[in-house]
Swiss-Prot record:
Function of the molecule: Involved in transcription repression and activation. Its interaction with HDAC2 may provide a mechanism for histone deacetylation in heterochromatin following replication of DNA at late firing origins. Can also repress transcription independently of histone deacetylase activity. May specifically potentiate DAXX-mediated repression of glucocorticoid receptor-dependent transcription. Component of the NuA4 histone acetyltransferase (HAT) complex which is involved in transcriptional activation of select genes principally by acetylation of nucleosomal histones H4 and H2A.
UniProt GO cellular component terms: cytoplasm; cytosol; NuA4 histone acetyltransferase complex; nucleoplasm; nucleosome; nucleus; replication fork
InterPro entries: DAMP1_SANT-like, DMAP1, Swc4/Dmap1
GO molecular function: RNA polymerase II-specific DNA-binding transcription factor binding; transcription corepressor activity
Bias (Basic and acidic residues): 1-11, 26-48, 258-267
Residue numbers carrying Phosphothreonine: T446
The protein, known as: DNA methyltransferase 1-associated protein 1
GO biological process, one term: response to ethanol
Cross-link Glycyl lysine isopeptide (Lys-Gly) (interchain with G-Cter in SUMO2): where in chain: K27, K214
Disulphide bridges, residue numbers: none
Classification via Pfam families: DMAP1, SANT_DAMP1_like
Gene: Dmap1
UniProt keyword Ubl conjugation, yes or no: yes
Modified residue annotations for Phosphoserine: S449
């Protein structure tokens, strides 16, 4: 059964503690349920955060007592939170002043330090860092049989191995401490070569048959060449550094031109292949009987690559579509190609939007695809002509300057105005010597075809004027 307190909670009413304890509801509570009685609560003063101060900074300044932050900096603890030390109630672990010895020292020196009483009798904790290099030891008989060298005496070899044990194979320190007065002056590479040669000999002699050997190898010649190259690199003059940077920049330019030439040759080859494929398919369609053409019209459509011609979308989805939508050019064709295509159609006397019958749509799309392919081939041919003309001018300039031994006409002769590069089924009919020049010399970026034709015509006219 619900009590008065439950009813008060449901109606969101508050009352005195006596009423809440007894569970009685007054008349005012039932008549005016919206009026809530304010609870007596301790009023706390709040301070507004100053403008421009971050919330995190203000939280650091705000103390637990809700006091206002100080206006002036002071040394008192008011306004800042102090970290209290958390002291446990456990018993403190005892520490003891005890002696210890370092195993790395051979003199047996005794030292003292504080350690926990529970660790009494244990080894020195830093003894695990006492790592030494195992330098091999050889006998007199082994030296005479396997390690004898005319350039090294036994006393000098013993001195080298003694320094190797003392300085843990730090050959720079060994070279500094080497007795150059008593023995011959040696370089760091000579010391390394002698040491590792003896280690390899001893490893081969003492090896057990059937075990894998880890023989240290040191190439002294390679190390000498490496240091010599580093010394030359360090001793370069500012002029040499600038020249090297210039050569690196030229190398990057040559590589970029080479990549661009390869890309253009690949695009040109794709265009030629597409032209050959389209011509072959046209011949096949002409040879086929007329009765079978309507049956194979859907299955044997000429497949023009995306890189050449126009790739029209296929409307194979369910639903009703207009046939004129098949003549719509895709978005991949640029505005420049569209304008050139419209100009060629007007020159041929073909309507830009003919009646969209089945046969007309198919033939109109094929015609526009062939026209775009022809436009791309003309552009590629113009690029090649422009590059060839630029290379011919550069070759003649070098020949006049005396850089090339052969005359300009011997390598690349002047071509007549009527000679034009023809496109055959195998490729472009270019001279092999011209291909060699194009592969070796990097051509600059080509401008528009109109500018190319103007520059070519102007250069030819200048040549004719110079001739006597």
């Amino acid at each position: 059964m619900a009590t008065g307190a439950d009813v008060r909670d449901i109606l969101e009413l508050g009352g005195p503690e006596g009423d809440a304890a007894s569970g009685t509801i007054s008349k005012k509570d039932i008549i005016n349920p919206d009026k809530k009685k304010s609870k007596k609560s301790s009023e706390t003063l709040t301070f507004k955060r100053p403008e421009g101060m971050h919330r995190e900074v203000y939280a650091l300044l705000y103390s637990d007592k809700k006091d206002a932050p100080p206006l002036l900096p002071s040394d008192t603890g008011q306004g800042y939170r102090t970290v209290k030390a958390k002291l446990g109630s456990k018993k403190v672990r005892p520490w003891k002043w005890m002696p210890f010895t370092n195993p790395a020292r051979k003199d047996g020196a005794m030292f003292f330090h504080w350690r926990r009483a529970a660790e009494e009798g244990k080894d020195y904790p830093f003894a695990r860092f006492n790592k030494t290099v195992q330098v091999p030891v050889y006998s007199e008989q082994e030296y005479q049989l396997y390690l004898h060298d005319d350039a090294w005496t036994k006393a000098e070899t013993d001195h080298l191995f003694d320094l190797s044990r003392r300085f843990d194979l730090r050959f720079v320190v060994i070279h500094d401490r080497y007795d150059h007065q008593q023995f011959k002056k040696r370089s760091v590479e000579d010391l390394k070569e002698r040491y590792y040669h003896i280690c390899a000999k001893l490893a081969n002699v003492r090896a057990v048959p059937g075990t894998d050997l880890k023989i240290p190898v040191f190439d002294a010649g390679h190390e000498r060449r490496r240091k010599e190259q580093l010394e030359r690199l360090y001793n370069r003059t500012p002029e040499q550094v600038a020249e090297e940077e210039y050569l690196l920049q030229e190398l990057r330019k040559i590589e970029a031109r080479k990549k661009e030439r390869e890309k253009r040759s690949q695009d040109l080859q794709k265009l030629i292949t597409a032209a050959d494929t389209t011509a072959e398919q046209r011949r096949t369609e002409r040879k086929a009987p007329k009765k079978k053409l309507p049956q194979k019209k859907e299955a044997e459509k000429p497949a023009v690559p995306e890189t050449a011609g126009i790739k029209f979308p296929d409307f194979k989805s369910a639903g009703v579509t207009l046939r004129s939508q098949r003549m719509k050019l895709p978005s991949s064709v640029g505005q420049k190609k569209i304008k050139a295509l419209e100009q060629m159609l007007l020159e041929l006397g073909v309507e830009l939007s003919p009646t969209p019958t089945e046969e007309l749509v198919h033939m109109f799309n094929e015609l526009r695809s062939d026209l775009v392919l022809l436009y791309e081939l003309k552009q590629a041919c113009a690029n090649c002509e422009y590059e060839l003309q630029m290379l011919r001018h550069r070759h003649e300039a070098l020949a006049r300057a005396g850089v090339l031994g052969a005359p300009a006409a011997a390598a690349v002769g002047p071509t007549p105005a009527s000679a034009e590069p023809t496109v055959s089924e195998s490729g472009l009919g270019l001279d092999p010597t011209k291909d060699t020049i194009i592969d070796v010399v990097g051509a600059p970026l080509t401008p528009n075809s109109r500018k190319r034709r103007e520059s070519a015509s102007s250069s030819s006219s200048v040549k004719k004027a110079k001739k006597p």
